[in-house]
UniProtKB/Swiss-Prot annotation:
Keyword Transmembrane helix in annotation: yes
Region listing for Disordered, in residue ranges: 1-26
GO terms (BP aspect): vacuolar proton-transporting V-type ATPase complex assembly
Record organism: Drosophila yakuba
Protein name: Vacuolar ATPase assembly integral membrane protein VMA21 homolog
Superkingdom as given in the UniProt entry: Eukaryota
Chain ranges on the Lumenal side, renumbered to this chain: 58-68
Transmembrane regions listed in the UniProt entry: 37-57, 69-89
Keywords: Cytoplasmic vesicle, Endoplasmic reticulum, Membrane, Transmembrane, Transmembrane helix
Coiled coil (residue ranges): none
Alphabetized Pfam families for the sequence: VMA21
Protein topology in the membrane: Multi-pass membrane protein
Length: 105
């Protein structure tokens, strides 16, 4: 029997390995999307919070000085940053539902 026939007679020897690789790739992609989402949230949420508070909320509706508006907007941005970090840490610590690591041999 030649090596060509042995490979043909062997069946799907590579199929479980390929399926396992696709499963790992899917998990890696899911992890990448999660980390990218939280990175963007941590970067953009405080910036958006600062400018929304400064431009639309505090300047429009409250009659306070410019310095106090900037300080209040900065405090709001710091609070938003802590909320985003807290969400990331909570997700990293407790994990997503169904994301338990399973060992396969």
């Amino acid at each position: 029997m030649s090596t060509k026939n042995k490979k043909a007679a062997g069946g799907n020897g590579g199929a479980p390995k390929q399926t396992r690789q696709q499963s790992h790739d899917s998990q890696d992609y899911s992890s990448f999307k999660t980390v990218l989402f939280y990175c963007m949230l941590i970067v953009f949420l405080p910036v958006l919070t600062f400018f929304v508070l400064k431009g639309f909320v505090l300047d429009q509706f409250l009659d306070i000085s410019e310095v106090k508006v900037n300080i209040a907007s900065a405090v709001g941005a710091v609070v938003a940053l802590h909320v985003a970090l807290g969400l990331y840490i909570y997700r990293a610590y407790f994990g997503a539902p169904g994301s338990k690591a399973s060992k396969t041999d």
